[in-house]
């Protein structure tokens, strides 16, 4: 107890995923690219994750979307990242080329 407030030493896990996407051939401008990326980012945010376009910013035919989630249990982080990956993979307008995932615990540097 610190200053009359109970302090928890609970665990915290952070998970990240970066989705590398191939956009359709008609994505020849940044405006067209945004028309594909924005709905995917909005759909990902329904999983209560932070989501943003994080790479390939100047490439019209590619996009990288990153997500991050924090939870008290590693299993929950994995479940949320799995759900995000399924959502992106199921989008018929883009092709999911690769996924890079990381899970960090409180003891990771």
Segments and roles (model prediction):
Residues 51-73:
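Short, charge-patterned binding micro-sites
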Residues 47-55, 95-102:
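Short beta-strand elements
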Residues 31-50:
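Short amphipathic alpha-helix segments
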Residues 10-16, 58-62:
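Short, flexible turn/loop "capping" segments at secondary-structure junctions
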Residues 2-10, 51-57:
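Short beta-strand/turn micro-motifs at beta-sheet edges
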Residues 71-109:
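C-terminal structural segments of small proteins and small subunits
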Residues 15-21, 66-67:
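Active-site-flanking beta-strand signature of metal-NTP-handling nucleotidyl enzymes
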